A protein has these predicted regions:
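Extracellular/periplasmic low-complexity linear segments
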Residues: 1-27, 49, 54, 73-84, ...
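Mobile, glycine- and charge-enriched loop segments
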Residues: 24-78
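Short secondary-structure boundary segments
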Residues: 33, 99-100, 121
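Short, well-ordered secondary-structure micro-motifs
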Residues: 40-44, 66, 108, 121, ...
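Short acidic, glycine/proline-enriched helix-loop-strand junctions
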Residues: 61, 91, 103-126
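Compact, charge-rich alpha-helical regulatory domains located at protein termini
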Residues: 66-95, 114
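Short Gly/Pro-enriched loop/turn and capping motifs at secondary-structure junctions
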Residues: 75, 101-104
Length: 135
């Protein structure tokens, strides 16, 4: 056989977009979305291979910032779920909304204390935040 380490590696961009750190009192939520329409972006049917991720900062139940970033791992090989989970953790995400995650990405986020909230695919991001009780 080819051995364990000969499979495709996930795509790793050397130029990940910088994003400001979370300030105290702010909850940062992330959600995979299909199109970059800010708070109106629909939740994607897939997690790790969604074309975009929306990062939402919420303070006191009010949305204070929304940014939709392209998912640089969407076209990667195997192991994309782990790469996306690590990327979200590096952004300071504490809540993930969206469809079911793969077992490895889910385990990594749970170990890091990230709350995972199921969200119906196609639901606008703002509505999903309200349903989850975040905003």
């Amino acid at each position: 056989g080819r051995g364990r380490r000969w499979g495709q590696q996930p795509y790793m961009s050397p130029y990940q977009q910088p994003y400001r750190q979370v300030v105290p009192g702010v909850v940062r939520a992330a959600a995979p979305v299909d199109v970059p329409q800010g708070i109106n972006s629909p939740i994607s049917y897939v997690f790790a291979r969604a074309p975009y991720f929306a990062l939402v900062d919420v303070r006191g139940g009010k949305v204070v910032n929304v940014q939709v970033l392209p998912n640089q791992y969407a076209m990667g090989g195997g192991g994309v779920g782990i790469a996306v989970a690590q990327w979200l953790l590096s952004m300071g995400v504490t809540v993930v909304l969206g469809p079911p995650l793969g077992p490895k990405a889910s385990a990594l986020l749970q170990q890091a204390g990230v709350r995972m909230v199921p969200a119906q695919p196609g639901t606008p991001l703002g509505e999903a935040l309200k349903i989850a009780g975040i905003a």
